[in-house]
């Protein structure tokens, strides 16, 4: 607990507090904890995009080694690149924004309705899971018209290209033990 507060104080000194940067709408729970861990383990963006550290790998072995080590090292940065691409895709597609508004509006109405009373159809109580499935079914035509399927594949493709090319061409720093290893002759 004390170590966590020390890390938070260090981040606040730098002007970045993970708790203030996270939206207040995300409830405390597993999702918020995961996002806080990602935010805490993010690598400096300066080293992430340093142009002097990009070069072509010499062979396939080095390429594979770079891919594995960079994905492991910059995992949190890659998550935020992915989230940024999702945000870009949603903001630049007005129909997708409308479809998301319809879906989240229906979910919010159902949430308010369940606070007041249970929903009963044909003499049977409808569970919240079924209600949200109904909201998804109602908003499905909007997602289909907005081209949500192509947006999903665009985001996945753009993420793979960006992360794959960064991981392949970004030089890895040698680990502490690798610098001093000598091979027998």
From Swiss-Prot:
<dbReference type="GO" id="GO:0098793">
    <property type="term" value="C:presynapse"/>
</dbReference>
<comment type="similarity">
    <text>Belongs to the PRA1 family.</text>
</comment>
<keyword id="KW-0472">Membrane</keyword>
<feature type="topological domain" description="Cytoplasmic">
    <location>
        <begin position="113"/>
        <end position="131"/>
    </location>
</feature>
<feature type="region of interest" description="Required for interaction with prenylated RAB3A and VAMP2">
    <location>
        <begin position="30"/>
        <end position="54"/>
    </location>
</feature>
<dbReference type="GO" id="GO:0005794">
    <property type="term" value="C:Golgi apparatus"/>
</dbReference>
<feature type="transmembrane region" description="Helical">
    <location>
        <begin position="79"/>
        <end position="94"/>
    </location>
</feature>
<keyword id="KW-1003">Cell membrane</keyword>
<feature type="transmembrane region" description="Helical">
    <location>
        <begin position="95"/>
        <end position="112"/>
    </location>
</feature>
<dbReference type="GO" id="GO:0051020">
    <property type="term" value="F:GTPase binding"/>
</dbReference>
<keyword id="KW-0963">Cytoplasm</keyword>
<dbReference type="GO" id="GO:0070064">
    <property type="term" value="F:proline-rich region binding"/>
</dbReference>
<feature type="region of interest" description="Homodimerization">
    <location>
        <begin position="175"/>
        <end position="185"/>
    </location>
</feature>
<dbReference type="GO" id="GO:0016020">
    <property type="term" value="C:membrane"/>
</dbReference>
<protein>
    <recommendedName>
        <fullName>Prenylated Rab acceptor protein 1</fullName>
    </recommendedName>
</protein>
<feature type="region of interest" description="Required for interaction with GDI1">
    <location>
        <begin position="165"/>
        <end position="185"/>
    </location>
</feature>
<keyword id="KW-0333">Golgi apparatus</keyword>
<dbReference type="GO" id="GO:0030674">
    <property type="term" value="F:protein-macromolecule adaptor activity"/>
</dbReference>
<feature type="transmembrane region" description="Helical">
    <location>
        <begin position="149"/>
        <end position="165"/>
    </location>
</feature>
<dbReference type="Pfam" id="PF03208">
    <property type="entry name" value="PRA1"/>
</dbReference>
<comment type="subunit">
    <text>Homodimers. Interacts specifically with both prenylated Rab proteins (including RAB3A and RAB1), and VAMP2 (synaptobrevin-2), in an exclusive way. Interacts with NDRG1. Interacts with free GDI1 in the absence of Rab proteins. Also interacts with PCLO.</text>
</comment>
<dbReference type="InterPro" id="IPR004895">
    <property type="entry name" value="Prenylated_rab_accept_PRA1"/>
</dbReference>
<feature type="transmembrane region" description="Helical">
    <location>
        <begin position="132"/>
        <end position="148"/>
    </location>
</feature>
<feature type="topological domain" description="Cytoplasmic">
    <location>
        <begin position="166"/>
        <end position="185"/>
    </location>
</feature>
<dbReference type="GO" id="GO:0005886">
    <property type="term" value="C:plasma membrane"/>
</dbReference>
<keyword id="KW-1133">Transmembrane helix</keyword>
<dbReference type="GO" id="GO:0045202">
    <property type="term" value="C:synapse"/>
</dbReference>
<dbReference type="GO" id="GO:0008021">
    <property type="term" value="C:synaptic vesicle"/>
</dbReference>
<feature type="region of interest" description="Required for interaction with prenylated RAB3A and VAMP2">
    <location>
        <begin position="175"/>
        <end position="185"/>
    </location>
</feature>
<keyword id="KW-0968">Cytoplasmic vesicle</keyword>
<feature type="topological domain" description="Cytoplasmic">
    <location>
        <begin position="1"/>
        <end position="78"/>
    </location>
</feature>
<dbReference type="GO" id="GO:0098978">
    <property type="term" value="C:glutamatergic synapse"/>
</dbReference>
<keyword id="KW-0812">Transmembrane</keyword>
<keyword id="KW-0770">Synapse</keyword>
<dbReference type="GO" id="GO:0042802">
    <property type="term" value="F:identical protein binding"/>
</dbReference>
<comment type="function">
    <text>General Rab protein regulator required for vesicle formation from the Golgi complex. May control vesicle docking and fusion by mediating the action of Rab GTPases to the SNARE complexes. In addition it inhibits the removal of Rab GTPases from the membrane by GDI1.</text>
</comment>
<dbReference type="GO" id="GO:0016192">
    <property type="term" value="P:vesicle-mediated transport"/>
</dbReference>
